[in-house]
Every structure is written in C-alpha cells, then in structure tokens.
C-alpha cells in the first residue's frame, strides 16, 4: 500500500471554497476528518469538541499546522515522542514516500512524513513565525491577539487581502473572485465535479479516497455509529454527534436578537438570516434567492426533476431526504405524538410542534395584520395572501387562480386524474396523503374534529375553526357595505355579490358561476356523476350536501325549529317557508272551526278534513287521500317495499318498523 503524507489527510478549504460546498459535501468532509483523526493512534485529539465549520468562518490558521500542533502535545499533556510508523496502516504506512526519507525534528526527535509537513511541524514546535501582520485588530477567537503571525509568506499575503479586500483571481465560468490562486483552483475543481476517485454505483467523483469511502455508505446502508442511549445507528460520525444533542438537550448557539438557542452552528446561521433577510444563494436558472445552500439545492431540483432519495418499500422517489424520512413513517402505523386539543396524531415531534402552533398562534413569525404567529417565514407568506387576496398560481386549463402551490398541484390532478393516492371507492386521485385522508371521510362519514362547546363534529379541522367563530361571534373580515364574514374565502365570495363577477364558465353550456365549486357541482348535471350514496336506501347524489339532507329522512333529524309554534323541520327551505306563514296575514278562515290560512288552497285542503272527501286515490292499493302531497308520500311506501323490501323507520320503544316517517310519527303517539 502506498504511503500517504499527513498533509494528504488534513485538507484545507478557504472561506470562499467552504461557502461553495453544499450541505452534503460539508457534512461528508466533517465525517471524513473526524473519522480519520479518530483512527490516528498517536494523535489524541479532542476532535469531538471541535466545530469544523467554525474553522471556515475564520480560516486564518492553517489546518495542517493545527493538527501538527496537537500532534506535538498529547491529550494528557506529555510529549508525544511517537513516530509515523505507529500510525495505523490504514492511514499512514511504515514506508516513506518514494525519494523522501523520514525527516527528524531537531526539537524533540519525532519523525514526520514529508518535507513540507516537517517545515510546518518545526515552525509550530519552535513558535517561529517570521511573517507578522501589525494592523490586524481583535480576532473573533476565544483569545484576543494583535499582530497576527504566519509561518509562510503566501499565507501572510493571503491574510493581508482579508483587510484590503483584494481578490485578483477570477473564475471564468461564474465570475467569482478569489484572494489566492489555490482557492481559485479548488473552486474550479468543485464546479467541474471531477476527481480521481469515482463511485462505481452512481459515478460521482471525489478528490480523496476517504470521501469516496464515506459516500459509499449511502449505497450500502452501513451504519457503524450507534447511540448508546436509544440504539439508533448512523452512517456518519457527525450525524451521530448531532443526534447525541437530542438526548443532552445541549444548545450552545444562541441568537442575540431573540435569544433562541440552537444545537448546531449551521442552524444558528440559517436562523440569523431570518432577522437580516440575507439570501446569498441564488438559483442559476430563475435567480430566486435563498438564505441557505441546502434550500437552493432543493429548489434547483424543481428545474432538473432530480429525485435522488428512493423509498425501499414502495419505490417512490423524493428530492429531499427529509421528505423520504417522513414518507417512510407512512408505512409504519405508529404515531406517538398526539394533540390533546383535537386528537390528531403525528409520526414526528417536529410535525407535532408545528401543528400546536396552529392552536396557540405563538409562532416566532407574526402577521402584521392579525397578529397570528407561524413557525417559519414561508407559512407566514402563505398566510399573508389570505389578507392581500394574492393568487399567484393560475391554472391554464380552467383559469382558476390559487394562493398556494400545494392547492394548485391538487387542483391540477382534477384535470389530469393522476396522483399517487387513489380512492378505492370513487377512483379520485390526490397528491398529498393528508388531502386523500380528508377525502376518504366523505365516504366513511368519519368526523374526528369536535367542538368543545356544543359537541358538533366535523370532517375537516378548518370547518371546526369556522364553526367555533359562531360561538365567539368573531368576524374579522368586513365588507364596505357593512357585512362581516368569518374567513377570507367567504369574504371574497361575498364581494362577487356586489360586483356580479362570474369568472367560472361551463364549456358545455356556457353558464357562468361566481365560485369554482358551483361550476364543479354544475358539471355533474352534464356527466350524470353521482359519487355520494346513501347507505340506508342506496340512493345516489351528485353533491355531498344533498346526501346529508337526504339522510335526515332516515334519521328523523329536524334541526330547524320554529320559535313561534315549536314545529320542527328537516330542511332549511321548509323552515323558511313555514316562517313566512307567521309573518303573513291569514285572511282565509274556515267557517266550521275558525282556523285561518294564508292561501285559499290551504283552506280548501283543510275543509276536506270536515267533509271526509278524499279525491286522490292510490292506483296500487286503492287508498284515498285528501291532498296530492299525502298521496305522493304514500306512494313512496310502495316504492320502498317493492325495491328494498325493508321498513327503515324503527320505533325505539317497541322495535316496530315502518315504511314511512309519517307512519312512525303516528305510531309514536300511541305510546
């Protein structure tokens, strides 16, 4: 095996190069360095406490010199006195480099592989730094120093450029400038993506074999680092260290503006940009800016269509690793995090915490109009559209505009019929599992969201929130003409009553509608589609609302009660019609009993109860009735017996069943 010098193990990046690396490359580099140094027998370092990313905030110390500094002083404070031959064979062998003999330090007699490493080592050991810069002010390191010194003249020149801002080396591909030639060369290599060590499975190239070895674990699934507390295993040492903080709760990085603390420096930096608004990472295709490189990388995949993360169980691919992890939990039924307010359960703690913000409204990002808080800026931006009415996502097929991208994607499936989640009952497809689950409740009639005040249940959480405002009386959206609305959607719909605008037109008959759902409902009159079926009598309906109203025939529910006479009705239209009876003048009076009516036809029907006249006869059984409506009700009893053979209306007291609701009511009076 060929020998490798220590400087081949310790690789430098400048501040500019470090900024160019993506999050995956940074993490991989950290893992390699941590794992490599852990394998050095004589280099006993406190690497676990070392934040590699911090070194690239202030890249003023040569990393190789730092390593050799620690090489001189062992962990217990004694001199190392060990030779390179004692380093593990996997890192450095006993043989020297071709043509280069082992160089011995005159300071302590240690042997170090390679002349440049020796130079650095001797200078560190002797404290000899011939190039000193006297204008350098206080450093942001743990100790303050003036007049920073350097072991090499080129390092001294590069450092000077930090103060002058001079960057004489330009990249011809992207135009970015660098303070040193080495930085430019490394930057160009990163941009080209070339390297001598290539992955046999995916073809990705790397500059160092150790990076390739770490990358190969993404294919093999090898996880050598196991947490002692929860037995969770990790492919990379840095991931293991990050995970450890979930047990200890350590959050060493605190924001000076809002005092929020973070376990990782990268998370802290990302958070800081929410205050400053800085977005240094731009998409090369559409120039959209992002606060961190990972968000930019994820966004760029929307242009390329790349989805590198695949589920092993179902083969579904994702552009983000977090999306894959969330998806994998859908194969497991376990949801350990349950909301005590609404009963909704979650697979992940983060999802649960975000959900709780919906109840409390205490998120860090506040809406200036209504004061509601959100967990992230994107959620706040989406919410602000409910106030502004902005709808940036427009469907090219039907012209409908939507406020949110997720709503737009769901809407497009209505046209295409494509979607990963298909309903087994009606075949309708959906993009998101949450929307699919909500749709399934239209078939099962499940209502998991209950009002704490009145006990009324709803299929959708938004319907519950809308209902809760009927108790509080809150109506924040006011029309200029005086009417107030519960939510922004109702307010927008109300405005069309003044303008008369009807933007949604049926392509078949040309009829226009003010709301998209009215158009969708109307389309079923052309297609004849009736997806909602009554479980009792199997009658089908084109609209869910019609099914709900129909079900009252079987249940006997009469939610609309007249305050004047106490009469109850199953349907709102009948109730409103009845209310007018009390409001109108009753000028038609029965001469026999004195009862008054608003219309002459009502009086004529009533008079038949005195005369015993029954002009309306049933052709099937010969039974006669005083009114046509009574005959129609009677005919339904024949239809039900013929077609269903059942009596759906059962008396709860004696168990006797009846074909019609009116028969059940008459029977109840006998009890």
Curated annotation (Swiss-Prot):
GO terms for cellular component: nucleus. Transmembrane segments: none annotated. It comes from the Eukaryota. It is found in: Nucleus. GO terms for molecular function: DNA-binding transcription factor activity, RNA polymerase II-specific; RNA polymerase II transcription regulatory region sequence-specific DNA binding; zinc ion binding. The keyword Membrane does not apply. Signal peptide: none annotated. Keywords: DNA-binding, Metal-binding, Nucleus, Repeat, Transcription, Transcription regulation, Zinc, Zinc-finger. Its main location: nucleus. SMART domains: KRAB, ZnF_C2H2. InterPro entries: Ikaros_C2H2-ZF, KRAB, KRAB_dom_sf, Znf_C2H2_sf, Znf_C2H2_type. Gene3D superfamilies: 6.10.140.140, Classic Zinc Finger. Residues 4-86 form the KRAB domain. GO terms for biological process: apoptotic process; regulation of transcription by RNA polymerase II. A zinc finger (C2H2-type) spans 134-159, 169-191, 197-219, 225-247, 253-275, 281-303, 309-331, 337-359, 365-387, 393-415, 421-443, 449-471, 477-498, 504-526, 532-554, 560-582, 588-610, 616-638, 649-671. Induction: Induced following exposure to ionizing radiation. PANTHER family: ZINC FINGER PROTEIN, ZINC FINGER PROTEIN 564. Belongs to the krueppel C2H2-type zinc-finger protein family. May be involved in transcriptional regulation. This is Zinc finger protein 443. It comes from Homo sapiens (Human).
